[in-house]
């Protein structure tokens, strides 16, 4: 594999790069609200923070249990519904949630998605209330890599696909790009791979990579699926 492919895969395997600028923020916020992390992780504090997600968990349980009987255009719910409808009757068994501190600031996040990898929605708490960090669906998906990092795969068209590593900010309110690759057509109509560290799909803001399209499509980073609790059988709040 050529030089850039080796470099990019090293990022995925070692996760050693520091976070870059905030040019790709799914939440669209330039200055997230100030949060107060837990000082002491005792059982009572943790329980209170987790309880803040109880209504959301039950909402997602309802969507997953009867996806064809529900409809929603609410950010955070559309990707969950899409995945649940694709799974049909298996959705309550194959989808779940996890309340865990993924950013490392002492405040737990809520992740919802498939047990086998894709995260459809991620929330954190701001001023004690759930706030959507990002949403994933079939053509714009996120898989957990570990250490607060997610691998992104998306597609805008047959010729435009993107892959990259994004990390949660320390306060957990948004994602920051570490490395991003995407394909586009050059003036001759050939598929070319471009790279940047902002998450931009704009060729003018990117550099041409020496990675071939075949190498791009062959990228297969090892994810670390979150240990989600299936909605079926989980204790209702």
Predicted regions and their residues:
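C-terminal motif of bacterial Sec signal peptides marking the signal peptidase cleavage site
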Residues: 16-19
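Loop/turn residues immediately N-terminal
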Residues: 116-121, 159-163
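Beta-propeller blade termini
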Residues: 93-102, 141-149
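Acidic, small-residue rich beta-repeat scaffolds with periodic aromatic anchors
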Residues: 23-66, 153-237
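Positively charged n-region of N-terminal signal peptides that target proteins for export
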Residues: 1-9
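Acidic/hydrophobic-patterned starts of short beta strands in beta-sheet-rich repeat architectures
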Residues: 103-113, 148-152
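Beta-propeller blade repeat segments, especially FG-GAP/WD-type strand-to-loop junctions
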Residues: 120-133, 168
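Blade-edge motifs of beta-propeller repeat domains
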Residues: 39-92, 129-141
